[in-house]
Amino acid sequence: LLGKFAREFIFQIPELLKTEKNPNPTASMVTNGYLLMFGPEHADEQYKALENHKACEAGTKNIKGSELSKIFPYINNEGIETATFTDNKSEGWIDPFMFHSALKSKAIELGAEFIKGEVKSISEIKAKTIISAAGCWTKKLLEDIPVVPQKHTVFRVKCPKHIPEMPLTGDLTTGVYWRPEGGEYLAGSPNSVFCLLYTSPSP
């Protein structure tokens, strides 16, 4: 349900976040959908999850592993028992910078004040609600908050053939994921910390 709300909000950005300085806000959503693939060990769990998706009218469909290559010829379905895919243009990804810029512009128009500066310590703040937006640096300000920085490596891959309509694809048997980005692809895996010896460009 939260995802449905987010989707509806994203689609309404041109109206909801329109400002005098930013009359045409957008998050540049790419509605290629999500394709998630599961092995036999997670199939039953995913069938149950799919029932929940249907109850929420998410539009998620089940695809048998044996049928995958007929729909997505570039997919090797070896070891895949089942997959889920949403093909109703309701799922995809956005440009986070453009989205945050639109939110900031609207907040300023509504009276928000953005103060640039470096906060090195906090003594006492009286407020009903405090939101920390320090991200991975949160622990420097709030030592008791269990947030620590962690580096993740995402690869940009260029292939001879580009498939712009490809969905964001996740192979849950390996954890590897990828999606198109411009004329290339972004790809990653659970093992997201790599030795520089293997990731640095060749001399």
Q: For the regions a protein language model found, what residue spans apply to each?
A:
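Dinucleotide-binding Rossmann-like beta1-alpha1 core, especially the glycine-rich loop
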Residues: 1-71, 175-177
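Small-molecule pocket liners
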Residues: 35, 150-155, 174-176, 183-185
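Short beta-strand and adjoining strand-loop segment in the mid-core
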Residues: 35-40, 85-91
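Feature captures the FAD/FMN-dependent oxidoreductase FAD-binding
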Residues: 36-52, 106-114, 120-124
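Helical element adjacent to the flavin cofactor pocket in flavoenzyme catalytic cores
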Residues: 88-120
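Central helical "cap/lid" subdomain
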Residues: 129-167
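Mid-domain catalytic core of redox enzymes
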Residues: 160-194
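Conserved small/polar residues in nucleotide/adenosyl-binding loops
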Residues: 198-203
